[in-house]
């Protein structure tokens, strides 16, 4: 779950990390009033969306008058911002962040992720701030300095100082960086984050460090114990089908293809998508119904897949272990009866109660294509799409 920049900065402030004075505004009038609270210009106005690349898309601007602030707010509030990280529709803009402009001398990068290989929280710092860290990692990986947090000892001030020295910071900046490092590490651990970035972390012309931007992602599996973060969730920034799936504890990710996939198990789901691609098809989604699938969840999964207008056929691939194939069959029958299906449905059932599931589908009278293997299923669903 991602948060907006203004929400990330609110959390930064609570953990003792410096950020520009700013206000999130929902109307042009609020934006003008925010400028008055901040004081004399120039100011920076930023569209608040869950996507990078806002500046290049016109969603970030330095302005010198309140009239310009109003014009920016009127131009963007209620509209959609399209960046290289969004789809063609873009993301809706419901808030504008108005901040005091900062005199920048240098731009740095500081971020943290959970590294699965080491099973540790790993901090990354670089002198190449203001650009995508992925690009830096690809082109000049030697400019990224890493620091691993010991899960027993926790973050230590000396680790922050060590990173500061590697970034070429001196004097008071070393202490400032160490404080930001400790605040960010504490925030990461206490709030069950999956990712956090300050990009850029700037050195001002006065020699001070300020968190100029903030990107924060929470671990969705830990939200049950983070009620404050749950309240910050902006569902308007998420895919409607993905949000609906999450309510039913379904793992769904929308893709750009036209073959809907319903599978149990993340590994099998990825393998199913691969074999569909291998035979010339394009998956419309990743959907894992999980091991504890019920008839109701399977029905809802089917409805979510069919709510995508791009879907021209559906492939159901179930290996019955924990989940019973006859329950999957009941869910398919229930979904078809409730929603109505006008696209071909290819079903491959193997394992626990597969014969009973196949019999239920055959007796239902539904127009379902039975597959004998995963390869057969992929070939049949690709052929079904090609014939439409």
UniProtKB/Swiss-Prot annotation:
Annotated binding of Mg(2+), by residue: 199, 213
Pathway: Carbohydrate metabolism; tricarboxylic acid cycle; succinate from succinyl-CoA (ligase route): step 1/1
Comment on bound cofactor: Binds 1 Mg(2+) ion per subunit.
Known catalytic reactions: succinate + ATP + CoA = succinyl-CoA + ADP + phosphate; GTP + succinate + CoA = succinyl-CoA + GDP + phosphate
Major enzyme class: ligase
Chain residues that bind substrate: 264, 321-323
GO CC term (a single one): cytosol
UniProt key word ATP-binding: yes
GO function terms (MF aspect): ATP binding; magnesium ion binding; succinate-CoA ligase (ADP-forming) activity; succinate-CoA ligase (GDP-forming) activity
Cofactor(s) recorded in Swiss-Prot or TrEMBL: Mg(2+)
Binding site for ATP: 46, 53-55, 99, 102, 107
ATP-grasp domain mapped to chain residues: 9-244
Known EC number: 6.2.1.5
GO biological process terms held by the UniProt record: succinyl-CoA metabolic process; tricarboxylic acid cycle
One Pfam family recorded for the sequence: Ligase_CoA
Classification via InterPro entries: ATP-grasp (IPR011761), ATP-grasp_succ-CoA_synth-type (IPR013650), ATP_grasp_subdomain_1 (IPR013815), Succ-CoA_synthase_bsu_CS (IPR017866), SUCC_ACL_C (IPR005811), Succ_CoA_ligase-like_bsu (IPR005809), Succinyl-CoA_synth-like (IPR016102)
Keywords: ATP-binding, Ligase, Magnesium, Metal-binding, Nucleotide-binding, Tricarboxylic acid cycle
Glycoprotein listed as a keyword: no
Record family assignment: Belongs to the succinate/malate CoA ligase beta subunit family.
PANTHER family xref list: SUCCINATE--COA LIGASE [GDP-FORMING] SUBUNIT BETA, MITOCHONDRIAL (PTHR11815:SF10), SUCCINYL-COA SYNTHETASE BETA CHAIN (PTHR11815)
Assembly and interaction partners: Heterotetramer of two alpha and two beta subunits.
Protein role: Succinyl-CoA synthetase functions in the citric acid cycle (TCA), coupling the hydrolysis of succinyl-CoA to the synthesis of either ATP or GTP and thus represents the only step of substrate-level phosphorylation in the TCA. The beta subunit provides nucleotide specificity of the enzyme and binds the substrate succinate, while the binding sites for coenzyme A and phosphate are found in the alpha subunit.
UniProt xrefs under HAMAP family: Succ_CoA_beta
Protein name as it appears in the record: Succinate--CoA ligase [ADP-forming] subunit beta
Species of origin: Serratia proteamaculans (strain 568)
Gene: sucC
């Amino acid at each position: 779950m991602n948060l907006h920049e203004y929400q990330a900065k609110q959390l930064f402030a609570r953990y003792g990390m410096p950020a520009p004075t700013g206000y999130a505004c929902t109307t042009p009038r609020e934006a003008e009033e925010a400028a008055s609270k901040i004081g004399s210009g120039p100011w920076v106005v930023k569209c608040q969306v869950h996507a990078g690349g806002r500046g290049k898309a016109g969603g970030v601007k330095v302005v010198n008058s309140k009239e310009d602030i109003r014009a920016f707010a009127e131009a963007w509030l209620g509209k959609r911002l399209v960046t290289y990280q969004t789809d063609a529709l873009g993301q809706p803009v419901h808030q504008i962040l108005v901040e005091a402009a900062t005199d920048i001398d240098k731009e740095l990068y500081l971020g943290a992720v959970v590294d699965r290989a080491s099973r540790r929280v790993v901090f990354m710092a670089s002198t190449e701030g203001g650009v995508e860290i992925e690009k830096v990692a690809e082109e000049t990986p030697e400019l990224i300095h890493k620091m691993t947090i010991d899960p027993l000892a926790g973050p230590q001030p000396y680790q922050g100082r060590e990173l500061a020295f590697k970034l070429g910071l001196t004097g008071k900046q070393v202490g400032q960086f160490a404080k930001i490092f400790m605040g960010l590490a504490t925030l990461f651990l206490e709030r069950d984050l999956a990712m956090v970035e300050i990009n850029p972390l700037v050195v001002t012309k006065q020699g001070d460090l300020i968190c100029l931007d903030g990107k924060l992602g929470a671990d969705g599996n830990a939200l049950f114990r983070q009620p404050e973060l749950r309240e910050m969730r902006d569902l308007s920034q998420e895919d409607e089908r993905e949000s609906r799936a999450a309510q039913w504890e379904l793992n769904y990710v929308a893709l750009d293809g036209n073959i809907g996939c319903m599978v149990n198990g993340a590994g099998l789901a990825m393998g199913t998508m691969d074999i569909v691609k291998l035979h010339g098809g394009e998956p419309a989604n990743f959907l894992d119904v999980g091991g504890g699938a019920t008839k109701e969840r399977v029905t809802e999964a089917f409805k979510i897949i069919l709510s995508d207008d791009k879907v021209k056929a559906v492939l159901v691939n179930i290996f019955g272990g924990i989940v019973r194939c006859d329950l999957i069959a009941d869910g398919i029958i229930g979904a078809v009866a409730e929603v109505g299906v006008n696209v071909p449905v290819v079903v491959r059932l193997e394992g626990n109660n597969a014969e009973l599931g196949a019999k239920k589908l055959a007796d239902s009278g539904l127009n379902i294509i039975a597959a004998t293997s995963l390869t057969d299923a992929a070939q049949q669903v690709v052929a079904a799409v090609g014939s439409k």
